[in-house]
Amino acid sequence: MLEHLSSLPTQMDYKGQKLAEQMFQGIILFSAIVGFIYGYVAEQFGWTVYIVMAGFAFSCLLTLPPWPIYRRHPLKWLPVQDSGSEDKKPGERKIKRHAKNN
């Protein structure tokens, strides 16, 4: 039932994370200002809360899923380097012993 979910991308690059954070904060700030002004004019604090909550839900919808806009700059990983000491089995490694101070 959940097999198709494993094929969905779940990562975001660093520039995408920055963009998502800026969008999230901007939408919240905009909805707070609009909500405050409308609530002040209508003299209903409840409308202020509703507008801010709607802005929060909208910003979550835009920023929480890893949309393709947030994956435009994938990370370039370094290639794997062969190291002689890492390929040895644990029994083949030389054990470093510290000299005892008498």
From Swiss-Prot:
Tissues expressing the protein: Expressed in the pancreas (at protein level).
Domain of life (superkingdom): Eukaryota
Compartments it resides in: Endoplasmic reticulum membrane
Record bears the keyword 4Fe-4S: no
Sequence intervals crossing the membrane: 27-47, 49-69
Topological domain ranges for the Cytoplasmic compartment: 1-26, 70-102
Its membrane topology: Multi-pass membrane protein
InterPro entries membership: Spc1/SPCS1
Region (Disordered): 81-102
Annotated keywords: Endoplasmic reticulum, Membrane, Transmembrane, Transmembrane helix
Lumenal face residues: 48
Keyword Magnesium attached: no
Post-translational modification: May be phosphorylated.
Pfam families: SPC12
Binding partners and assembly: Component of the signal peptidase complex paralog A (SPC-A) composed of a catalytic subunit SEC11A and three accessory subunits SPCS1, SPCS2 and SPCS3. Component of the signal peptidase complex paralog C (SPC-C) composed of a catalytic subunit SEC11C and three accessory subunits SPCS1, SPCS2 and SPCS3. Within the complex, interacts with SPCS2 and SPCS3. The complex induces a local thinning of the ER membrane which is used to measure the length of the signal peptide (SP) h-region of protein substrates. This ensures the selectivity of the complex towards h-regions shorter than 18-20 amino acids.
Protein's job: Component of the signal peptidase complex (SPC) which catalyzes the cleavage of N-terminal signal sequences from nascent proteins as they are translocated into the lumen of the endoplasmic reticulum. Dispensable for SPC enzymatic activity.
Family per record: Belongs to the SPCS1 family.
The protein, known as: Signal peptidase complex subunit 1
Gene: SPCS1
